[in-house]
């Protein structure tokens, strides 16, 4: 979702998606995905449920810019040609989930994704499942 939100739709080139741990869950726990956005932007997405270090990190590298966002530690670092910018965020990690549910229960849908967005996400999930 984050990648589509930032860069738009992408085409999947390669996927490994399976359950490889002994966790007692009914879902895959490992994903390695490579793909390409329009404008020759490449992506690599790695997810796993079994790592012992809680990590939610987004890394973006380009010709003149690098961005590192740590969603657990609530900070972001921007590197451009000349400077490094560090930003610390103060937010409650569960806030967005609570607000999402509160808005749904109160029938406030102004910040919700569209049906088309949801269908696009489901299309990506279905493509990943087909790679097995």
Enumerate the predicted regions with their spans.
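NAD(P)-dinucleotide binding in Rossmann-like oxidoreductases
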Residues: 22-29, 39-102
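C-terminal helix-rich "cap/oligomerization" subdomain common to oxidoreductases
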Residues: 36-38, 103-132
